[in-house]
Amino acid sequence: ATFDAAGARLFTATWDARLWAIGEHRTAAGEALLPGTGYLELVAEALKAQGETGAFEIRDLYFLRPLAIPEGAARDMRLRLARSDAGYDFAVQSAAEAEPGGRVGFQLNAEGRIGFGLTPPRPLDLAAIEARCRDGLREDPAGLRSPQEAHLDFGPRWRVLRREAYGPGPEGRGEVEP
């Protein structure tokens, strides 16, 4: 990690589609993408590298454009972590050519804010949630198919949801297997 001219921490990497989290997360047309949860993991890892170990909250998260990696190519990316009054602001950027063979700059893929000082949530009563969530039960030991699979081609490591059910209102439960 380095720092930019404003003193913000910069975490950089070069990725290609051999990284399973990207190579096994493709559009139906075959384009490899960093999944949305990948941005969250990047933020968590950057905070850890920054020495932040407490609970945090991501606010005002905007996905502005996909971080796509063409087959057989690599893409430079960076995460900028800048201190703010509430915690940090972050931006994830990926390298982009202004025109083929032209100058390379960075485009903004996602941005958000990070806050601290959260009160830890109280423990969940999993038995009570399970008792309420009996509708729409679906299960498959090999992994349930996601509605997103109509548009995305996931590799086998993404099919982790084994069981799901819903309760009254906006409540549901799922069982995942890593």
Indicate where each model-derived feature is located.
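Acyl-thioester-processing domains in fatty-acid/polyketide/NRPS systems
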Residues: 1-178
